[in-house]
């Protein structure tokens, strides 16, 4: 990710390091020597944008969901603001962060307000801004100079959701077996049989009896794993394991 950013913005200063090694002080404490060094190097900061690790609050995480040590890194955004004092702040995460067992989002909001920031918090769905996918994310907007509003963002930039067909219909004519990006994968025979079953029976959700044992007749949240996307609707949230 950093290499891509550096290619897009030549000459920009890149720092690849854990945030807690740069801002190592406790909230409410005086700036540490390391923090003062970072501040001197940064100078004035107009906008700070942060996306703390979301795995610990993802609904797809069945191991450390809502109680992951990495969730505490959300609070490093509050410490950054305390030390650097950026004029505007944007924090993005999965909606599950709002239900973290240690209330990292709520504690961050309280700290930002104590620092004099005006806040607007809420959940936005990209399909409400013209995307062809359902993807909800928690946003925190904070500013020292005005009252931010997620509602205004919805009003100014909201748009009708686009369909899956709008995004990928052209791929039907773009198949190139010699191209990594334009060639379909070769599913295993069992997977191909399930795919054909959906189309042959005009179904969008694979019946339990057609699923493998690990996802058969169980109370799970992976319904779409063996489903078919609706061409005339936005896609469900696409994950790396889709």
Q: Which functions belong to the PLM regions below?
A:
Residues 111, 137-242:
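S-adenosyl-L-methionine-dependent DNA methyltransferase catalytic core
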Residues 1-85, 95-99, 106:
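Core alpha/beta nucleotide-donor-binding catalytic domains of modification enzymes
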């Amino acid at each position: 990710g950093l290499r891509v950013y550096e290619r897009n913005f030549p000459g920009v200063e890149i720092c690849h390091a854990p945030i807690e090694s740069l801002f190592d002080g406790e909230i409410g404490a005086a700036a540490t020597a390391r923090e003062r060094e970072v501040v001197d190097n940064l100078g004035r900061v107009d906008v700070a944008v942060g996306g703390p690790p979301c795995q610990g609050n993802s609904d797809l995480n069945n191991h450390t969901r809502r109680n992951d040590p990495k969730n505490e890194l959300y609070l490093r955004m509050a410490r950054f603001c305390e030390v650097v004092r950026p004029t505007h702040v944007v924090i993005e995460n999965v909606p599950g962060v709002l239900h973290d067992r240690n209330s990292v989002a709520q504690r961050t909001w309280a700290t930002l307000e104590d620092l004099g920031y005006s806040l607007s918090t809420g959940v936005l769905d990209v399909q409400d801004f013209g995307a062809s996918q359902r993807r909800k994310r928690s946003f925190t907007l904070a500013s020292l100079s005005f009252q931010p509003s997620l509602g205004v963002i919805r009003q100014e930039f909201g748009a009708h959701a686009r369909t899956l067909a709008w995004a990928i219909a052209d791929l039907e004519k773009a198949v190139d077996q010699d191209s990594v990006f334009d060639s379909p994968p070769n599913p295993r025979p069992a997977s191909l049989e399930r795919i054909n079953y959906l189309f042959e029976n005009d179904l969008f959700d694979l019946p339990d009896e057609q699923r493998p044992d690990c996802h058969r007749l169980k109370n799970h949240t992976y319904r779409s794993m063996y489903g078919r996307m609706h061409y005339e609707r936005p896609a469900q949230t696409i994950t790396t394991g889709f």
